[in-house]
Amino acid sequence: MAGPHLKVFFVVAEAVPYAKVGGLADVAGALPKALARMGHDVRLVLPRYSSVDEARFKLSARAEFAVTYRGQRTQVGLRETLGGNGIPVYFIESPPHFHRPTIYSQPDDLDRFAFFALAALEAPRAIGWQPDVVHAHDWHSALAVARLRATRAGPRPAAVLTMHNVQYQGNFGPEWPGQAIPDAGTLGLDRVLAGGGNHSMLALGVANADAVNTVSETYAREILTPEYGYGMERLLQSRGDRLCGIINGIDYQELDPATDPALPVHYSADRIAPRARNKAALQRRAGLPEKTDVPVLGMVTRLADQKGLDILARALPRVLDEMDVQFVLLGTGQPEYHRLMREVADRHKDKAAFVEGFDPA
């Protein structure tokens, strides 16, 4: 029997097709569409980065409102477009915060995304829409969860926090909340620290969420250990009754090889022969010799210790020296792995290619 239809508000730092750095964008682009197909009223908010093209995405002005941060009232705009399945997608317009060369890795990321989280909570009120659930993702929007619990008297939306990677926490110094956030004392930082948490946005979100979710049942167990909890394992253990893991899915509409516009040639489970032409196209695009009898190993990943890049960096040269294979890596991440992958590609020009960045094609 179907449950009640809910109003769900996603608060995210990135979502395809508007802004993408990692897997968070894929989930934030696909999950709202799946929920909408189930009959829920789903809406999405993210920052209006300079890379979000107004003409391409047909952005229109929806509202203006003020956000208080670091003792100042800042006027922001709310832009709107319709995404997949007719889902309203909103963008917080504040050029000083979001018109930057990159989405992340700015020296004031903590302030940028704290401002975004506070602005995101004001957006529903500005458009006259009251969500039943606010669903924040990772540290960038975790403050919205803490703020929601702290400032709403009486009935309020349920607060859900999904952690895609516990290693990235949005850490701050002990003095920062009082300097930056109005009524910071209501956020329960003392409760966070007493529960084994640390000074971080993610810890504030975990401590205040009605439900805490992560990307698989296995990862939900792993983050309870010192090896994978990155200093948050005690706090996560204390929220064990509210913690679960739900494995990420994929968007079958976007990633169907029978219709995917990014593929040079379409194929299906019943017709796989055309894949050979896609392989040749990948070899050309990567600058590798077109060899029909050589397997091509492809890898799309964030270049980080957590993804096993340290193991890959040691093993790959031997594989390429001893086996007749080609290897293509697509991704971004830690600078040392960029350097190592470039060195491997330079030493094995006919066998290895490193494509820096993310490209859905």
What role is predicted for each listed range?
Residues 1-361:
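Catalytic cores of nucleotide-sugar-dependent glycosyltransferases that transfer UDP/GDP/TDP-activated
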